[in-house]
Amino acid sequence: VLLDCGNFPVSPFCNALNDLGLTPKDVKGILISHGHGDHINQHTLKISEAFDIPLHIHQKTYNVVSKRLNVSHSSKLVKHHNERAFRVNNIKVRAFETFHEGGYVGKPFGFVLEGVGERKFKIGYLTDTSAVSEEMVECLVDSEVLVIESNNDVKMVEDNDPRDSNWLQHLNNVEAADAVVKIKNASRGKNALKYVFAAHISSRHNTPKRVLAMFNEKFKKANINDIEIIITDQEEPTPVITI
């Protein structure tokens, strides 16, 4: 399952899968969080149609994407989801609403993925939100792996673009770290939050060093010492983990 697919033309997409020992046939679905172009664009639709990969997208998001791209995607490949759980092969997917505005956003969501059958796991995905609600925390409790945006450092924003309000649509380092602490403290599973991927890190308004410093500061105050923080990069592949 792919979570968003906005920056890969077909050939680099295939190459990236090949580096992982996979092919497009191994991808059984693409989940779309919202309608902004870095999450879904023409490349996404071409990949979906070229390899018959279903596109799981909310109706409101599909409507704005269709308008923005001026296209009509193959109806047999479009699966409209809501907040009810659905299956993609042996993975149960639950979508939950997030807070994100601006442009062709549609209706934004985060996701929880859980293994069905013998292989049990829980993965949480939360990016592109201006806040983290108690309902979101509840959804993400006991995730073994969490992908969460840590988009900006407030001081860097104030120094670089004090009049730019776009960053308010994303979690800053403090908000992201606080959310992780809340999720960890509410979890009961022994493997809860073994890995946290800090994602959607702004190249202009943030640095990996600032992300790590804030997460470690918050974890120390909360007496949390068993979470591995993995910094993601917009240009370089993220290390692969096994759960």
Please report, for each region that a protein language model flagged, where it lies by residue:
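Pre-active-site segment of Zn-dependent metallo-hydrolases
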Residues: 1-32, 41-42, 132-136, 176
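Conserved beta-strand hairpin/beta-sheet module of binuclear metal-dependent hydrolase folds
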Residues: 1-20, 107-128, 145
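Active-site neighborhood of phospho(di)ester-bond hydrolases with catalytic His/Asp-centered motifs
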Residues: 2-6, 27-36, 56-59, 124-127, ...
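Short beta->alpha connector loops
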Residues: 7-9, 36-38, 99-104, 128-132
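Active-site HxH/HxHxD metal-binding segment of metal-dependent hydrolases
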Residues: 18-84
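Metallo-beta-lactamase
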Residues: 58-120
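Short, charged/polar "capping" segments at the starts of alpha-helices
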Residues: 61-67, 205, 238-240
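Cap/insert and terminal regions of metallo-dependent hydrolase folds
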Residues: 134-232
